[in-house]
Swiss-Prot record:
Protein name: Multifunctional CCA protein
Catalytically driven reaction(s): a tRNA precursor + 2 CTP + ATP = a tRNA with a 3' CCA end + 3 diphosphate; a tRNA with a 3' CCA end + 2 CTP + ATP = a tRNA with a 3' CCACCA end + 3 diphosphate
Further facts: A single active site specifically recognizes both ATP and CTP and is responsible for their addition.
Gene name linked to the record: cca
Cofactors that this protein relies on: Mg(2+); Ni(2+)
Length: 425
């Protein structure tokens, strides 16, 4: 059987990166002969099989022909007469159109290795324009490979713009966009995904809520980068530095959507943007059917990031109420940490502030621990119930956090903290 290692495994090995998964292309076989060899068919749209021992995917070499607009209008031809080069030619980028023989010889008919060395993301052929998903894939690869110096080849960017202008991206269903977006969020430089989409004109079609942030000014005293769109992508990259949690990264990306809705005559002030942005956030989440955990965390970060930045200035009662609204006073809560990381990313996502500490997070962590450690048994012994129990427990928590604050020196978060940004100014 002629089986060739293809795609990402070859690319990543040449880049010196860990190989995440190994995919194979088989030449000269049919579904019947593959099944006879013990392979299990799993492909729905084209012949893909699982190896009986390694369970790696083996696909029959195939060609594709476009028959309708969008990304679903394809006729697939998989047969023993399809060559390896024909299979590689249908792929998106030259760096993904390489194969390796069983004895380790590189098969590179489209210059993938050359483009790896030049750090270029270049499309293989004119067939690239037949599938709008490839715009998203190129953007996702920039999110992965920008830290290694990769950029989109000029001719590929031109082709992507033509596809957008022709309305190809309008045929993408939200679930497909979300699938690529979610993968991009997990990459080392997720902001590059959005920059690439903006460069080719696809951002305003697919993520208008993000596109509208560009050109909206913020107070230069707190935001030297000024532009809200620039700030948003800086925050996203800071979130990627701080956490691998995709929900926290999503919350960081969407926290300032309300600033795009501030009337221009009020610029650069954005008072009330936390409330203004909730509708845009829900529209985005509804459109892409975002997971509920993403939506809930993003809503909390949007509503309360300003209060988090002012944590040391808040009255103790307000601080306890904030923790309660965040759901952080439940003993097994796991949402406070991603909330704090998203807020820290916001504070650091400003020109010149990237390495600033964010002691507000530690103060809120300590306050939360003090509040949840309160012993409620005396209230139970008093037979308090319902709202009366809740009010009494709140007072105990306020007293516990007040004691914590009093025990700290003025130089700590119980005293004064540097105000990270004037969100309402």
């Amino acid at each position: 059987m002629k089986a060739f290692l293809v795609g990402g495994a070859v690319r990543d090995r040449l880049l010196g990166l860990p190989v995440r998964e190994r995919d194979w292309v088989v030449v000269g076989e049919s579904p019947e002969t593959m099944i006879a060899r013990g392979f299990r068919p799993v492909g729905r749209d084209f012949p893909v099989f699982l190896h009986p021992e390694t369970h790696e995917e083996y696909a029959l070499a195939r060609t594709e022909r476009k028959t309708a607009p969008g990304y679903r209008g394809f006729v697939v031809h998989a047969a023993p007469d399809v060559t390896l080069e024909q299979d590689l030619e249908r792929r998106d980028l030259t760096i993904n159109a390489m194969a390796e023989t069983p004895d380790g010889r590189l098969v590179d008919p489209f210059g993938g290795r050359r483009d790896l060395e030049a750090r270029l993301l270049r499309h293989v052929s004119s067939a690239f324009a037949e599938d709008p998903v490839r715009i998203l894939r190129v953007a996702r690869f920039t999110a992965r490979l920008t830290p290694l110096g990769f950029r989109v080849a000029p001719e590929t960017l031109v082709e992507m713009r033509r596809m957008v202008e022709a309305g190809e991206v309008d045929a993408l269903v939200p679930e497909r966009v979300w699938a690529e977006f979610a993968k991009a969020l997990a990459e080392p430089a997720p902001s590059a995904f959005f920059r690439t989409l903006r460069d080719c004109g696809a951002l305003k079609r697919l993520f208008p809520e993000i596109e509208r942030l560009f050109g909206v000014p913020q107070p230069p005293r707190h935001h030297p980068e000024i532009d809200t769109g620039v700030h948003t992508l800086m925050v996203l990259d800071q979130a990627a530095r701080l956490t691998a949690d995709p929900s926290a990264r999503f919350a960081a990306l969407t926290h300032d959507l309300g600033k795009a809705l501030t009337p221009p005559e009020l610029w650069p002030s954005h008072r009330g943007h936390e409330r203004l942005g909730l509708g845009a956030l829900n529209t985005l989440c509804d459109r892409f059917r975002a997971p509920n955990a993403f939506r809930r965390l993003a809503e909390k970060v949007m509503r309360y990031h300003g209060l988090c930045h002012r944590a040391a200035e808040l009255r103790t009662s307000t601080l306890v109420d904030l923790l309660d609204r965040l759901g952080a006073l439940k003993r097994h809560d796991d949402t406070l940490e991603p909330f704090l990381l998203a807020c820290e990313a916001d504070a650091r996502g400003r020109a010149g502030f990237e390495e600033r500490p964010y002691p507000q997070a530690d103060w809120l962590r300590e306050a939360q621990r003090a509040a949840v450690s309160v012993d409620s048994r005396p209230l139970i012994e008093q037979r308090l119930q319902g709202p009366a129990f809740g009010r009494a427990l709140r007072q105990l928590r306020i007293a516990a956090v007040r004691r914590l604050r009093a025990a700290r020196s003025p130089a700590t978060p119980a005293g004064r903290l540097p105000h990270p940004q004037g969100e309402g100014e």
